[in-house]
Amino acid sequence: MANLKRTYHFIAEFFDVDSMGVMWHGNYVRYMEMARCRFLDEVGFNYLAMKEARFALPIVKLDSKFIAPLEFNQRFCIEVELLEFECFFRLKYTFLDLDGKKLCQAHTSQVAILLESKETCFYLPNDFIKALKAFVDSH
């Protein structure tokens, strides 16, 4: 449906690594969140806009495959690929070093819930879908 890709650059900070000097596995999720926030900012419908529209987008599924370690002070990028945005908001994350070597691959699935009732929606809100479609069409 979508398959739009955007790339965001980062550096592995000292507080991200363990005593062996490699990034602790839990911190990959934090970087995915930062990349997802940048992606949503580009779309023009970020988490603050979702709050104003009275819905949230919790993650209901996350999977990851760690291929090669990230080390302290290593520069890397995350390629975010939009996979679906009808019932689920699905993204694929590919962590790459600056030479293009794959370091990690992950996927998240998110569903919309109404903030007041916490009720799960069967589809993503129309305004969010419209923003995503406009973003895809413009790229």
State each model region's role.
Residues 2-59, 115-139:
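Hot-dog-fold acyl-thioester-processing enzymes
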Residues 20-22, 67, 101:
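A generic signature of intrinsically disordered, low-complexity regions enriched in glycine/proline
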